[in-house]
């Protein structure tokens, strides 16, 4: 029989509490949740209040234009369009003419480009003639007094391509571009027989006439045999050397080696190209290098000194590198035997690895006992907690009374062990 749990001292926190929470999602109940929490709580929607800039605005909604007609008409005219935005004033909706607009004063009225669109956006000829006059119709030959303009030398423009020099210093012609009036000439219909011009056959330019003599692609005939694909610049060397694979048809000759021929490799068939055709061709050389290398030993032709017996071959002696070095025999009695052949690399980069018994480290003497770490020192009852089975009753005694009652109300099987005498096994 388990004893009664300690209730503890009654505190204002316990008095204000509404008891343990039965919701498993609220296992870690806080003081605020137990004191002020309510089930199905929904926050109330507050009213939106304007910021401090709201008082700076003029109440345009309640403003009427007739309020300033008597009191302050000047201010009424200034703030007449304050309620309209710039976008609504500039981008007004499309207005279609309904026939109530007044007639224009002039039939050829000039409007801006931002006005009502016209079918013909170009200017009318009558409007152009008011500003410009055609020198072909009203030039110096037609109207007296319109002679070519003479500009003083000081005011003349020295730059090339000036439009004021065209058409007798009257500017470009009427409704023509600068290019048409300056550079395009009318070709005569009748042939000019007096100039005695003859037109020959069409020839290639310098860029294409000598294209076959390109030093990169073209080679002179002396550098290649007739029929060599190098002579054809349009054909690449890759296509001429790497031909497609051809399967045997059955009519090919069998690979038979003729009697008395050299077993040369495929590299021996080399066509040597003469750089200078005037130089005579050298004597035929053996084609294969392996044929000369792998030959049986032959007796060399003796010289006159060898025939007279004046040539002698001595014993083989060591070279200067081995003759100057004494015989290296390591003696166990030498103290500096390791320093005898000490190089610069060994002096600068020596080995700091311990040798002998110092190299064994922790493995010397068998397995070392484990030392307690920071985690083991901070937990005094580490072995007791890991070995023993947790007791719910002892856990409730060490907890806060309110937390203990909450655990007992949420889980009724938490207090006693499942296999205790309180829960007998069913037979």
Swiss-Prot record:
Keywords: Cell projection, Cilium, Cytoplasm, Cytoskeleton, Flagellum
Ranges of compositional bias, category Polar residues: 287-298, 321-332
Transmembrane segment boundaries: none
GO biological process, one term: flagellated sperm motility
Main localisation: other
Record's keyword annotation contains Cytoplasm: yes
InterPro entries listed in its UniProt record: SAXO4
Cellular component terms (Gene Ontology): axonemal A tubule inner sheath; cilium; cytoplasm; sperm flagellum
Subcellular location: Cell projection, Cilium; Cytoplasm; Cytoplasm, Cytoskeleton, Flagellum axoneme
Keyword presence, Cytoplasm: yes
Annotated region described as Disordered, given as residue ranges: 82-105, 273-298, 314-335
GO MF entries: phosphatase binding
Subunit architecture: Microtubule inner protein component of sperm flagellar doublet microtubules. Interacts with PPP1CA.
Protein name (Swiss-Prot/TrEMBL): Stabilizer of axonemal microtubules 4
Taxonomic source organism: Mus musculus
Upper classification of the organism: Eukaryota, Metazoa, Chordata, Craniata, Vertebrata
Gene label: Saxo4
